[in-house]
Amino acid sequence: MTTRTVQRNLWASAAVVLVLLLLWTDTTGGYFAAIDETETSKNCFCELEGSINDCSCDVDTVDHFNNMKIYPRLQSLLVKNFFRFYKVNLRQECPFWPDDSRCAMRFCQVENCEEQAIPQGIKDKGEHKEKAAFKYTREAQVGGSACSDGEDFDSSLGFLDTSISDQAHREFELWAKHDEAEEDFCIVDDHEEGSQYVDLLLNPERYTGYKGESAHRIWKSIYLENCFGGNNETANKFSNYVPHLDLRNVCLEQRAFYRIISGLHSSINIHLCSKYLLSESKDFLDPQGIWGPNVKEFKRRFSPETTSGEGPHWLRNLYFIYLIELRALAKAAPYLRREDYYTGIAEEDDEVKLAINDMLSVIENFQSHFDENALFSNGIASIKFKHDYKEKFRNISRIMSCVGCDKCKLWGKLQTQGLGTALKILYSEKLNLATESGLWDKPHIEADPIFRLSRTEIVALFNAFGRLSNSIYEMENFRCVLR
């Protein structure tokens, strides 16, 4: 064999080895190839690590705390009768524009609640007896005399009429409502004509097909008309939202407001992606179709490529609103422990009260709560900010009446009311006064305490927090699929 032949064979062998090596490297590139920093940085979760801005907590801590301790407890609690029936007005007219965009899809409709399905204790709660002025009515005075009706006592001469006239009662009622509404961060409509009980288990929050101009108008109104706004208007289609870099140039109150709305928006989008209509074919588990996670839709809503780099920051804002509502539950814990959670079903009522106490203890032991005192702490300017917050959130709850999909409207109203209740708790002077005076430690509390939440507010608070908890849990599932 000549030298030339040997060299030719060696070159051929080397070429074969090189080709095989290249093929092998390509197929195993997931393990051995150099990591492309550009590629790894462009995923939905690239910002979900480290400290949560404006909070003394990090993402991993919240993930573990929620997924291991809070989410399982909420799953068993929110199916109970006290929390599954929510009273809401879905017939309220839109106060901002003609209601011209009704969703005709069957998934937009709310399934009516059977009257007999609602526990009697909820229906017969006697809402008027919760009002501050009730104790002055004639009804409240009947049978309330401590005096003897003996023969030596002329009741007609000694009777002290402690009741008030119907006209005065109505005026007291208006004063009481006004005083209570002063601390509200949302519009409460459960007492209005047209309000009804809705079974939340029959109407889960999931994809309905409601989209297009009507849906965009809702969020555009919330962001543009209610947000404090940024200085830089970007040219892309996400100019309705404040770019995260612009948030560095605004004060904490403005930044927190935007992050709360953005976090709520992200949470709702995660619900739609995790409970997506995959097929309208009837399934034995759900006659309305086959539902499940849609990874493609999740990436479309949150990946940097489709959101001009903002999607991962929107996901990060979910943790911010979660910590706000978590802190509200911790602050209201002494009050919430005094609630009866009454439905008239004694065994279940006892179970709910035990479950509430257990979850509140877990929440109170969380080490990195949001510091609500960081907001509105700048003297006179803070008074105006606090007033603006209330007006803006009340306006957002009005906008929810403009949603053209009844099921979307239901969950939008519930979550904005839950958020409003959380803010009411965090910034209520009455709650601060009651707590500082040791009111919740007393064995007996007067029928009309200085601070009070209605049943509807409590139901909204826990269910809204349940939605945020569910979003963080579902996000971990998407993260596992996209790794």
Swiss-Prot record:
Keyword set includes Glycoprotein: yes
GO BP terms in the entry: chaperone cofactor-dependent protein refolding; protein folding in endoplasmic reticulum
Keywords from the named record: Disulfide bond, Electron transport, Endoplasmic reticulum, FAD, Flavoprotein, Glycoprotein, Membrane, Oxidoreductase, Redox-active center, Signal, Transport
SUPFAM superfamilies per record: ERO1-like
InterPro entries per record: Ero1 (IPR007266), ERO1-like_sf (IPR037192)
Top class in the EC scheme: oxidoreductase
Its EC number(s): 1.8.4.-
The protein's required cofactors: FAD
Broad class of where this protein is predominantly found: endoplasmic reticulum
Any Gene Ontology CC annotation: endoplasmic reticulum membrane
Binding site for FAD: 206, 208, 219, 262, 265, 301
Localization annotation: Endoplasmic reticulum membrane
Similarity annotation: Belongs to the EROs family.
Protein purpose: Oxidoreductase involved in disulfide bond formation in the endoplasmic reticulum. Efficiently reoxidizes pdi-1, the enzyme catalyzing protein disulfide formation, in order to allow pdi-1 to sustain additional rounds of disulfide formation. Following pdi reoxidation, passes its electrons to molecular oxygen via FAD, leading to the production of reactive oxygen species (ROS) in the cell.
Subunit structure: May function both as a monomer and a homodimer.
PANTHER family, sorted: ERO1-LIKE PROTEIN, ERO1-RELATED
Name of this chain's protein: Ero1-like protein
Organism lineage string: Eukaryota, Metazoa, Ecdysozoa, Arthropoda, Hexapoda
